[in-house]
Amino acid sequence: MADFYGLMLKKESGDMAIHTFAAIYIGTYDVSLKVFEFLDRKKIHQVDHIRSRLDLGQDAFSKGSIGYEHVEELCDTLAQFKEIMQSYRVDSYEVYASAVLRDAENELFVLDQIYLRTGFKVKVVSNSEHRFISYKSVAGRDTFEKMIQTSAAAVDVGGASIQITIFRDGKLITTQHIETGIMRIFNLLGDRGMPQQKYETQIEEYMNKKLEAFRAMYMEESVDYVILISDYAMELMKRIDENGHKDRQVKGEKFVRYVEKLQNKTLEEIT
């Protein structure tokens, strides 16, 4: 996740004895590695970025723990990342994990296996740390202040949960944490052998129920901007509008039209 990389880079960039830095993030859907070079105190160059698909959330949010096969696959992936880091002669590194480990009953076992197999000490971030990092990353962008001066909803979508923060007239009104993440919904509703249309209807009804109280209390008025925070937000932007991908913005009407087009496609066509 880019937000965590930003945090780790800030920590490391103050020490100019470090020339090459690696950051690993263990997420709900994948494990990723980024390697950076510090050219001076202000210039940071990304050397490599590798993502390995691994659905840890499929176990963690449906069974309550991460299965042995997924633990093996995770350790193998991290061992490969370690070899890549050695090839770059990395001076320092950080390894972070999201709620996918924090919510797993066998978190300590997984962390122990990672350490025994790779030597990595993984830092599992709390929900508050995770959200703070995400919003700090967004707040650092030039357009953020302009957006919140009228009204905006920052929606942080994760595998375990979503968090919605409402801004009006430059002030933070509320932040609400709702356990309706992508993997949680999929594990709850996604494997029942029902037709796609009925599946979509159930998701819509489920989300409406979860958001009912929130809308009644905080959404009597609409918002001018929606700030989407997600692992795949930029990929989504690129699919909707190439120009939107470049400036990280897309018109609401275009977003709605894109979603309507998806509703007429099968899951295979979408993926």
Predicted regions and their residues:
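Intrinsic structural disorder
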Residues: 1-7, 135, 162
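N-terminal glycine/serine-rich phosphate-binding loop of ATP-dependent small-molecule kinases
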Residues: 2-11, 16-22, 26-32, 36-97, ...
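Gly/Thr-rich phosphate-binding beta-strand-loop-beta motif of the actin/hexokinase/Hsp70
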Residues: 9, 14-44, 146-178, 231
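Helical "lid/coupling" subdomains associated with nucleotide-phosphate turnover
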Residues: 21, 59-83, 87, 100-110, ...
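Long, contiguous hydrophobic alpha-helical segments, chiefly transmembrane helices and signal peptides
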Residues: 54-56, 101, 157
